[in-house]
Amino acid sequence: GQVEGSELLNSQLTALSFSVDTNHIYITSGTQVIRNGNDTLRLDEEGNLVYHALAGESTRYRLPLRLSDQIEECRALAQATVGALCGDGRLYLQQIRLAGETLVVEFGYVLSGAQVQVGSEGYAAQFVLEAEQITQFTLRYRRYQAAPEQALVLPELQAAAALQALGRSGQELSLVYTDNGGERLTPAWYTAGKGGA
């Protein structure tokens, strides 16, 4: 489920290295906005928090030179924020990609050993790195509770048999939960690079 608004924002300012005393806070179209110097935080009603730094004008999230250290800094920030509040969920490194001079690092949620697909993008936290600093990030705050196995998903053996009947035997099955912002996650079996089974 979703994590609530202003209480969430207040609790996360310290973890995000924002001083409560020096912030200008206002609300626009249901989104809470905090400006601090050249940095902006926006928290929408769905529990999505977006940070933007004015390019080259912020020093809030400076990073070490080594790539592995940069990724570790992103992991630590994700763990201190969305990872600390996700209930029974856990974070994992989902993807690292290079887009020109920009590095994008994404972390996803996992619940009871299965990946959680959050919205259409899928990630729990995304960090954009440019010139040894984080210039933008998106944090999707969710709180998950593991439930006993339910009969809502086709048992693994039956899902494998269905794949074989479709001529796709030998492909690896993965259980994925879809989080569309509702109270419950939707489970489904997926094959690598394919749709649901």
Question: Model-predicted segments: where are they?
Answer:
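Aromatic/basic-lined ligand-recognition segments
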Residues: I96-A125, E130
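Preferential activation on post-signal-peptide N-terminal prodomains/segments
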Residues: G1-S68, E72, L77-A80, A192-G196
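A short, surface-exposed interaction/processing loop segment used at functional sites
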Residues: G1, L54-T59, F127, E132-L154
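Short, non-transmembrane alpha-helical segments in secretory-pathway proteins
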Residues: E4-A15, R60-G100, A146-R184
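Broad, structure-driven detector of short, well-ordered beta-strand segments within folded domains
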Residues: T31-R35, D39-E45, A125-L129, S169-N180
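A short, surface-exposed beta-strand/turn
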Residues: L41-A55, Q117-L139, G196-A197
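Short, solvent-exposed secondary-structure boundary motifs
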Residues: Y26-R35, V82-G87, G108-S120, A162-G170
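Activation/maturation switch segments at domain boundaries
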Residues: Y177-A197
